[in-house]
Amino acid sequence: MTSVHSLGFPRIGHKRELKKALESFWSKEIDEQELQSRAAQLRDRHWKIQQTCGMDFIPVGDFSLYDHMLDMSCTLGAIPPRYGFSGGLVGLDTFFAMARGSSTQPAMEMTKWFDTNYHFIVPEFHENMEFHLSSERLFDQIKEAQALGLKAKPVLVGPITYLWLGKEKDLNAEAHHEAQHHHDDSACHGHGAPVGNACFDRLTLLPKVLPVYAEILERLAGMGVEWVQMDEPALALDLPAEWHQALTSAYQTLSKGKSPKVLLATYFDSVAEHAEALKALPVAGLHLDLRRAPQQLDSFLKNYPADKVLSLGVVDGRNVWRADLDAAIKILEPAHKQLGDRLWVAPSCSLLHTPVDLDQETELDTELKSWLAFSVQKLDEVALIGRALSEGVAAVAQELSTARAAVQSRKTSPRIHNPAVAQRLEGLGKDDGQRKSAFQAREAAQRARFKLPAFPTTSIGSFPQTPEIRKARLQNRKGELSNADYQKAMEAEIALVVKEQERLGIDVPVHGEPERNDMVEYFGEQLAGFAFTRHGWVQSYGSRYVKPPLIFGDVSRPTPMTVTWSKYAQSLTQRPMKGMLTGPVTILQWSFVRDDQPREKTALQIALAIRDEVKDLIDAGIGIIQIDEPAYREGLPLKRKDWDQYLNWASRAFRISAQIAPDDVQIHTHMCYSEFNDILPAIAAMDADVITIETSRSQMELLDAFATFNYPNEIGPGVYDIHSPRVPSVEEMVGLMEKAVKVVPAERLWINPDCGLKTRKWAEVTPALENMVEAAKQVRAKHA
């Protein structure tokens, strides 16, 4: 029999029960015992679902109250000293302080889990750190599963991935530690790249970590556990050679102690270049992601050891489309012929990244629904493939026929393929994606048109989304507020935002985006080729879940999406109103994207739709248009060899969306992250007239990269950290701009906040913007 299993299941619950339990606990409505009771009920339900789907092994330990990497840190006792942990078992207070911060200490850093939209808590390491088994969580959950008669397969983040994803910290800097999102100045970024005086290599901690892993494995063996899954997705990255050597020595060390059989799981990309080393590891099996990297199978089947299991992920754990079961079975047949029962079938990776259960979607039309599979349905697919291999395809002929019909329907449906969109794409030439003139000519035309002062001020787009705004939007959605009354309410809010910016003296105002719920959903709801679910939630981090749109077909823009609002806002002021759009790459990155054509093609379709909107904004008299691309860097492939191809089409998609703008229309873009150095040529290739970036937290250090690269266009470095409720002083902002003037010519600088102001309160925003405008006046007086 071919064994079937899952690498992990969503934690959130069918009705987001985990979120509700966490928020009730944080607001002290329930106690720890009740929180743990609800968590146990969720685990029980999720395990039984997987058992009902026919899984031979049930993952245990994949469930977390916040994040599995944070769980691993607590299990290993890797607790930063600032949380006051004094040994023993890590309590829930410490766990949540690390995740969310406390009244006295900031949270640990959070960043994206490889190239997914899930965020993990980044482990912090210091040179003399000691590791001890500091949590009973995993063993308690194994007992729960065994009490239900389940064949539990514990899931652990492996030692190489755990250390690779962490950061070295200088303990002396802890006293000055500030909460920073996505970067920390006291970290060694990447392997062997010392920053500050934290210049030790975290790989040197491996000999200290391994005894704790060995202790965990020994205890699991003592509990009668047959298999343990060690996740090592970092092997799909471009790891330095010494890390690969460390992998071999680490697993050799672990193999010497008592242990269940180890299934080493890789996913998210190919590990074919390390096939020989991985096959030689003293583990009982390997898992490969054949959705992301089907071509790697041959390297592993060649001389695959006769004593090892090979688990193959053929059902996509990261997207929502129904599997082509015939194709999956065909891929697996040679492996099944060679390996027999040593072949296991699984999803490509943990199902953490897909919604829970398609059966909840009662409002999706039958045709579209037939093309989809959420986590529960994906396990059904895995089980079906396993049966087809074990019993022959005749045993599952009816199920295969149903799946085949759905796949065929998706291939041929007129809802998917729009000839007009195909024609537009085919019509794109090499010159498409180039503005009419070079930046110098555009800059001159824009200065003549707008006559802005030196160091012009603007904001990034959104203004505070008050409870009144959210209430009006909800009432409108429910039909309790007519469209006409909703429009009046939003216009009143826009008028207030514009008036406030006039009073403050902001040179390039925005309309504040009160009508927008989310920067991707707002556009997706108005574009053809998109669909939305009611319950398609996935975890972003902790208790924050997102419901990505589904891009199922060719994308086009039936009618203008933002023009009415921008035109109204411009009618209220003589100053140039900035139009606000979300860029093609960000819309792509934050959606479930169709898998029947290259992502590049979908990005270009979205770019053409955005270009239509840019044209209509220009025709309506809007002369400054921002096309946001906060997710531009997130799309980077895991391996550097694949970067150029992605960056070429991503920058082209942006240029196509902006290309229609004449010289005197100024195109802005906005990005917010901490690492620009390695993609600056691609950012320059976007050819936006102005780029605004998040720099206040790094004290303008990010600008050094732009200066070294000699970035040719205008830059608005953020001087107001909108992630904090703190109001920065005039002196602080002037100080930041003085740093900026040292590395970027004064005539190319703008002054703006780091990001949109949507999450802040008016009581914070008003004084902060007043100080920003005053800072601009002082910097102008000195440098203009």
Describe the residue ranges of each PLM region.
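Domain-level signal for soluble alpha/beta catalytic cores
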Residues: 1-784
